[in-house]
Amino acid sequence: MLHASAAALGGRAYLFSGPCGRGKSTHTHLWQQTFGEAVQVFNDDKPALRRLDGRWYAYGTPWCGKDGINLNQKWPLGGICFLEKSQENRIRRLPAAEALPLILAQTTYRLPPQYMELLLASLDSLLREIPVFLLENRPEEAAARLSFETMRRAAEEEGL
């Protein structure tokens, strides 16, 4: 599971992650405002990630945070985006070495030592196959458009 808010649009899931207070729920609400009913927010705190038949999927879980958004849905994963507040909207793709510590910090990883190797192997696969971004943003519709268009384009280029 990843500490994130998960939204589906255009047949793919996109996850917004970061520490508490970074605007994960705010950003998925902006997606709803910007793209309307085409967006499905299916988990607002801890979606599950799983690789199945050569493809990564995001799942809604009962662990859904204060807003209670926890739909029992599965979507192909199109991208993960870490959020930072900023005065300008900018997005960039993160190399795996930069993305790994961010993902580890937001992963439910209180595991016995013998399972850490499995977690790290899964994260290695995830980072090789799924584009990860950093979005510096203001809470506005322009940031929602920037994040979606950038991640959608990357997902299409990667064949996701």
Q: Which residues does each PLM region occupy?
A:
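Post-Walker A alpha-helix
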Residues: 27-28
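Conserved glycine(s) of the Walker
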Residues: 22-23
